[in-house]
Amino acid sequence: MKIIDFRVRPPLKGILKTAMYANAPRRDRFTRQLGMEPAPSAQKKSMPLLLKEMKDAGVSRGVIMARLSDMLGSISHQDVQAICKAYPKIFVGIAGVDPPSRRAAL
């Protein structure tokens, strides 16, 4: 059975500006509140470690979603596309639409 991670945030491009990477203490505190330890790939902002963690966990594909978020940090469609193009056998992208700006997305 193939495992797909539907919420992966690789440490690349603008994703590094999101709260997950830019505010490591917040990320680590939140992760521990959920009873888990922060992923070494997130702590070290390491793409090779992320790929190893995915492989070790049996994850065959990761889904990256674009989003517009002032509080948590935005992930652009261009960044999602570039990451998926660089790792076509690993990542799949999903567009994100900001509901107040939905007409601009058409």
Residue spans of the language-model regions?
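Helix-coil boundary/capping segments in enzymes
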Residues: 1-106
